[in-house]
Amino acid sequence: MSQRTQWLRLSTRVLPALIFLSQFFTSTALGAQGDKLTKRVERAAEVLTELVSVPDKAPPSALLSEATCVAVVPGVVQVGLGFGGRAGYGLASCRTGTGWSLPTFVGLKGGSFGLQIGGQSADVVLVFVNKDAGRLASSTFNLGGGASVAAGPLGRNVSAETDYRLKSEIYSYSKSKGLFAGVDVSGTKWELDYSANRKAYPKADDMPRGDDAKSVTALLSTDGAKAPEIFRPFLQSLVKNIGEGTVK
């Protein structure tokens, strides 16, 4: 038997096995990535419930009713000892004329979030109240630089006449030990997670994918009624805990 014939026979046996292994590991990796995003969404939904679970330690109802966008970043962790060594990933949605928008995945880097040195994690919630929040949220900027940010007030019964709305565009909350508290996150960098958006949104002519700034702007201005199933827990939690997504 010639060397060529032997090689051809071997290749017909080995090549299918290599193709199978390649497909197996690719699908396994994609599945793991999908599970990771699902857990991120589910945890963000839980954080919103925890945010309002203790009335005396929850954001004022008046503030939540005025929210134009809400971002939740669970499990921000300290990844280094210096400033800027903290990072976390979550998602955001904005109020539209008819409901909460298609969400976008986002990330926060730097800042303090109320964390202490030692690897502690914190859940962070940002409440946007400026009317142009959708445009702002679809860009990369520094909190406190590109947009004013302040520690959020607490107490569900704070009057709607309170002047908090005149002082800042974004109000921030962090929970690192038990209850939420208002925390100043000035200096934190807001980023868009295009890679996660590409994994979550299908290629479809009638839906943006959030894989660039323009597309994220489209996400945050499009009603989330047709959002992929992965986002359902988060959108339902927004309605239940923050309020309807319609604009007043």
Could you say what each language-model-derived stretch is?
Residues T26-A32:
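Signal peptide processing junction and immediate N-terminal pro/mature segment
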Residues A32-K248:
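Small-residue-enriched, tightly packed secondary-structure blocks
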Residues R13-T26:
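Bacterial N-terminal signal peptides
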Residues M1-L10:
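N-terminal secretory signal peptides that target proteins for export/translocation
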